[in-house]
Amino acid sequence: MTSSPTHQVVHEANNIKKQETPKEFFERQPRQGHITSLEQYQELYEKSINDPETFFGEFGKELLHWDRDFERVKSGSLLHGDAAWFIGGQLNACYNCVDRHAFATPNKPAIIYEADEEKDSKILTFAELLREVCQVAGVLQSWGIKKGDTVAIYMPMNSQAIIAMLAVARLGAIHSVIFAGFSSGSIKDRVNDASCKALITCDEGRRGGKTINIKKLCDEALLNCPSIEKVLVYERTGNKEVTLKEGRDYWWSEETQKFAGYLPPVPVNSEDPLFLLYTSGSTGTPKGVVHSTAGYLLGAALTTKYVFDIHPEDVLFTAGDVGWITGHTYALYGPLSLGVPTVVFEGTPAFPDYGRLWQIVEKHKATHFYVAPTALRLLRKSGEQEIEKYDLSSLRTLGSVGEPISPDIWEWYNEKVGKGQCHVTDTYWQTESGSHFIAPIAGVVPNKPGSAAVPFFGIQTCLIDPVSGIEIQGNDVEGVLAVKDTWPSMARSVYKNHTKYMDTYLNPYPGYYFTGDGAARDHDGYYWIRGRVDDVVNVSGHRLSTAEIEAALIEHNAISEAAVVGMNDDLTGQTVVAFVALKEHLIANLKADESPEEALKLKKEMILQVRTQIGPFAAPKSVIIVEDLPKTRSGKIMRRILRKIAAGEADQLGDITTLSNPQSVAGIIGSFDSQFGKK
């Protein structure tokens, strides 16, 4: 490791001390860690890069069950977009996640389902899971679903969603999960793009104490989905007013009871697709990312085991939805492939109160907790009193996913939730990567709050100069984050549109995988994610990372969340506009005071915060105080909407019903127009 240079490009690394894993982490391990030293990680990483055939070949045989052994570990390249792994092998993902564990440990919990209302919760053992998966697979098989067919799943985060995914995989078919929050139009687009033959859904959903009419949305979508032949409807609430279309729709309970006994899984080739997952937030036609069976499954198992330091005795609580990649990889395929119980949570962090997540951790003695920073910000806003009610001493690893975690949230997570006794694992990856790209391996890699740390096995991260397209060498540098070689769990294509796949990920920098994110590598070789490269503001020739400015703003003790966008300016090209949500008690104080002077004072402090932390060139020209920022159902801030508002295009926002808080948009428009004197 080198010492810090006098002038740092990566200023985030200033005054950040490395934090070693606390001794309590090791005391809570059920057995010795899978990796016991930083040197061992470095040796394994070097082997994974220099000899990937041997490295991944050994792990492929260790972690997966094969119906037919593979003949070759890898082929193809990023340049040609023809990556393939474990050629000649055959396996079944469902068998790997269910059968082998049901035979070995039939009474071990597989799915720990925590419903929106606790009274509806249930635990499924591996034996019970196998039985229910075989029943649903039997229904699908009787409908003619076979290897290579696509099946859409539109369900809330419950046990049946997991069962449905596994049942589809059991037949060698391809599941396409659609987040149960998308509109009927979004369902239609995804079903049609994937040419789905069947849909699995439910009558209604429960979330945050509210009932959601899931079946009604599906019915609206299916008016224009000619490929759908059959629909299986799980009775989540049992509302008798929910109706079925004769000849198309069938009740889950009635159909599954027709099938009993063991239904053998269908072996598929390593490169056969396991699932499609449509990326969210983009305009135009949906983009169905294709993941293979063997490579994806190995990536899920390998990262779950090593990044989190997961053991058979552990319990993984991933507070994510199967409608997104986090739920696929770390609520289903990662833990279940290893025979580790997974907590499936249907509800929200705030219902019935802000202690719900911690109550679940205590109840099931979860050892690993994995959540998005958005949820952590919400929970910090509510105060620590709810955390103190529960015994969280079972926790060993605290994970973060979905967006960069700011140092202040990292510290809060570490101190208030983990009591300074856990390893915080900030993970960087994507829908397209399938599994973790960059993460500090639990119990091994020292942490720097705000940094995702170092690359995982087989991931050759690098930084590219966006102007020259040349790889940037050395440390204390910044550029576009890319990967130099294929890895097992990488997405293989965009469904029915390989040209789009090439143009989006592989052609921008030939020979590299383009992540779309900017990043920096500090003097120790740690990576700092700076957000999407299109989330850049160009002010007077200065290319400013919005994530960087947001991180500076968040350090102001009044701010709960911040989002920065660029706004056109005749003089400087663009100016920085910051939308900030205040902590609850400050919102109340401002409303009670109704004093513009107090708000103005706060805004000046925020601008000064950025001037001091980054420099005058990065200071926002305008700060808009709002009650809430627009977010997707997965918790990501929709900066696209804020950019439209700042551009004076509030009448061109498109469909905002898929937001978790669409009501926030009108308030933001009002605050923006008020500040800029618009009627």
From Swiss-Prot:
Catalytic activity reported: acetate + ATP + CoA = acetyl-CoA + AMP + diphosphate
Binding site for ATP: 402-404, 426-431, 517, 532, 543
Keyword check for Cell wall biogenesis/degradation: no
SUPFAM superfamilies: Acetyl-CoA synthetase-like
Biased composition annotated in UniProt, kind: Basic and acidic residues: 14-30
GO (cellular component) term, any one: nucleolus
The protein's Enzyme Commission number: 6.2.1.1
GO molecular function: acetate-CoA ligase activity; acid-ammonia (or amide) ligase activity; AMP binding; ATP binding
Keywords of the record: ATP-binding, Ligase, Nucleotide-binding
Similarity section: Belongs to the ATP-dependent AMP-binding enzyme family.
Protein name listed in UniProt: Acetyl-coenzyme A synthetase 2
Chain's gene name: ACS2
